[in-house]
Amino acid sequence: MVKLAFPRELRLLTPSQFTFVFQQPQRAGTPQITILGRLNSLGHPRIGLTVAKKNVRRAHERNRIKRLTRESFRLRQHELPAMDFVVVAKKGVADLDNRALSEALEKLWRRHCRLARGS
């Protein structure tokens, strides 16, 4: 049976790991959210989140966005390519309800899967 856990090894933790993705990313985005990805050599995907206070003022909104993004990644982790992903929240993401945010993330994960197959 497939495990849908979210252990520490599936997270980007250090600034150098984030910098690695920012150097040569594949981009997939909507006006409210962008997912940057770069192939890694680990054999499994990892995720990092950036939700700036400048773009999402209230802490509970930032936490909601991060929680929904982590959950979306956790459920799709076995379908995603072995890439490091950085999810960047932009202005207006707090205006999306949970369903709209989840649908936007699903669309972006699918786009990254297509990009990885094409490269």
UniProtKB/Swiss-Prot annotation:
Transmembrane segments: none annotated. InterPro entries: Ribosomal_Su5_D2-typ_SF (IPR020568), Ribsml_uS5_D2-typ_fold_subgr (IPR014721), RNase_P (IPR000100), RNase_P_CS (IPR020539). It comes from the Bacteria. Its EC number is 3.1.26.5. One of its GO terms (molecular function) is tRNA binding. GO terms for biological process: RNA processing; tRNA 3'-end processing; tRNA 5'-leader removal; tRNA processing. It is an enzyme of class 3 (hydrolase). Gene3D superfamilies: 3.30.230.10. GO terms for cellular component: ribonuclease P complex. Disulfide bonds: none annotated. It catalyses: Endonucleolytic cleavage of RNA, removing 5'-extranucleotides from tRNA precursor. Keywords: Endonuclease, Hydrolase, Nuclease, RNA-binding, tRNA processing. Consists of a catalytic RNA component (M1 or rnpB) and a protein subunit. PANTHER family: RIBONUCLEASE P PROTEIN COMPONENT. Belongs to the RnpA family. RNaseP catalyzes the removal of the 5'-leader sequence from pre-tRNA to produce the mature 5'-terminus. It can also cleave other RNA substrates such as 4.5S RNA. The protein component plays an auxiliary but essential role in vivo by binding to the 5'-leader sequence and broadening the substrate specificity of the ribozyme. This is Ribonuclease P protein component. It comes from Escherichia coli (strain K12). The gene is rnpA.
